[in-house]
Amino acid sequence: MARDLLFEIGTEEMPAGLIGKIRSDLKDLAINTLEDKRLDFKECKVFSTPRRLVLFVKELAEKQEEKREVVKGPARSIAFEDDGTPTRAAKGFSRAQGVEVDDLIIKDDYVYVEKIEQGQDTAGLLKDILPGLINKLPLPRSMRWADYNFKFIRPIRWLLALFGEEIISFSMAGVQSGAYTRGHRFLVKDRLEVKDPDHYFDVMEKGYIIVDHNKRRELILKQIREIEKEIGKVMVEDDLLTEVVDLVEYPTAFYGKFDRSYLELPDDVLITSMAEHQRYFPVIDEDGSLSPYFVGVRDGIEDYIEEVRYGNEMVLRARLADARFFFEEDLKVSIEERQKELEEIVFQEDLGSMMDKVKRLKQLVIQIGKSLNLKESQLQSLIRAAELSKNDLVTEMVNEFTKLQGVMGREYALINGEDEEVATAIYEQYLPRYSGDRLPQTLYGRILSIADKIDNITSHFSLGMIPSGSQDPFALRRQANGIVNIIIDAQLPLKLSSLLNWSIEVLEPGDKDFVNEEKSFLLQRLETILDERGIRYDIINSVVRVGDDDPNNILSRAEAVMSLRKENPDLFVDLIQGLVRARNLASKGEGNNDINPEYFECREEKELYDIYRKIKDEIQRQFKKKNYLSGLKKLVDVKEPVDNFLDNVVVMVEDERIKNNRLALLQEISNLVSGVMNISEIALDD
């Protein structure tokens, strides 16, 4: 028999940006807990609104499965005499297991006991399971309230717990569980009784609550599509939509209007004012330009929607008026004055001002630009972009709208007559801003972004501010990922070690003990990105710390090894095994010995040497041209000669000349891939 389980945690309003993760974690925790308790169920779902987390388990078994455990004891010959009389060993084993000697089972000449743990009633178990879910739920942040020694994302105000029609009774943080929930906080005053889990959703609908976040999302989109028939295309950005869904319990979309004169402001200013500050969706005309409309979503029904529209229009009008004021004030300040203001902003304690950072960026972009063979005119543009890169940090607009850093730098640069390439680089220096964000698309933007990020990383490492575990307050991992992704995306021939060395040169730290740790950190981020691209872990390990540390070179080598393995896994493993055996033997040699064909005695070593001479130059030529797969495929030619040599030739003979000659040959064979991969890192058993 089975019943449905309904568990609702009613709270004060939770932060919308955290609800999705909490919902996912609650589902995982519930599933794992029920499975650990041996409770069968058909389906587990978790819903949420700003004021509730809802766990709904379909067809949860009324009783645990019984647990059977077989415990192995002493050998039969030790447990029993020849006549079957139990020994002290048998009695001790049975006593330790809580059974009688007669309950012992003899199988395969050993004594066993089968222990059966009867399943408990689910209703009784739930009295501990449900409060346990609250206590164990991982939360990004939590709070205490009243005088309870208990923390949760927000204060708990009610608990609904039903197993079928049975109330699961428990108390937590001064709240007693029961069969009651609450409807919309502004539309329903009285608490609502729920008879059973199936009854819950009807009760919620009558209480103006759409519990299912997916249905709220669909409803908002449907309402927006209706509004679009009147005002034009609505810009629905997915992250904003997700946030709005988690801000409301009963969504009703509406549109409003603002004065067309505000369209003179940069689009990003308008969009930020609407989306970031008011959670409105912008609207665009047929030509893709912003129109003087917005779409908002209220938490409630359509009653008094005109008053709601008017109120929101007034709020946005004030916000846009402020933005226009800040914009106009910023235009009154010259570039030279901005530069002076940067001297007053501390970049990082012990690392000088933001102006000091700008000076470092100017030096870094020169180093990077020269390594990429840029022309003098290009270098001058890069220097100009670096010089202006932080000016917008001291503007009124960025002070009010922090997410517009870079955006306003670009806008003000264009207004001041700077080249578009320079202005775009100022904006692109901050890309990517988060995982999955777009990368810089211009050469100057890529270089400035790399320079800014490597300077940030080296600066913080020099002060001992190094990411550890989940702690990364300065987002250094994200910035390192950005460097690697930019280099790979644009196929820039840049080595991570070069970037590190250049950043150290311009920073001039007193102590350089952090250098190796920072290099390892950068390589670890490269490893993460290779893993995200589907490269096997062992192949990543085999290529990352071999050869130069140009991410493109490393990626090319990794992909070549992956391709070779994928084409013929068995042949690949056999080849690597042979090369590893050759290298292991070669490591027993002392010093560097040249190969002398006159010392060959066996057909197998002559054949191996002949094939080595035949393919060596071609392999090196392909590797030099970075045609790694072609070079590795050529390496397959040595597989059979290597196997024949290792199977039939004794290497460690008494004659030192012959022994060293054979070791030298094996060393040369194993060196064929030394600049491409470390063969010892390849896993041969999976």
Curated annotation (Swiss-Prot):
The source's superkingdom equals Bacteria
In which compartments does the protein localize? Cytoplasm
Give one GO biological process term: glycyl-tRNA aminoacylation
List the GO molecular function terms: arginine-tRNA ligase activity; ATP binding; glycine-tRNA ligase activity
Q: Name one GO cellular component term.
A: cytosol
Q: Which reaction does it catalyse?
A: tRNA(Gly) + glycine + ATP = glycyl-tRNA(Gly) + AMP + diphosphate
EC category name: ligase
- Name of a matching Pfam family: tRNA_synt_2f
Q: What is its main location?
A: cytoplasm
Q: What is its EC number?
A: 6.1.1.14
What keyword terms does UniProt attach to this protein?
Aminoacyl-tRNA synthetase, ATP-binding, Cytoplasm, Ligase, Nucleotide-binding, Protein biosynthesis
Q: Which InterPro entries match?
A: DALR_anticod-bd, Gly-tRNA-synth_bsu, Gly-tRNA-synth_heterodimer
Q: How does it assemble?
A: Tetramer of two alpha and two beta subunits.
What's the family?
A: Belongs to the class-II aminoacyl-tRNA synthetase family.
Name of this chain's protein: Glycine--tRNA ligase beta subunit
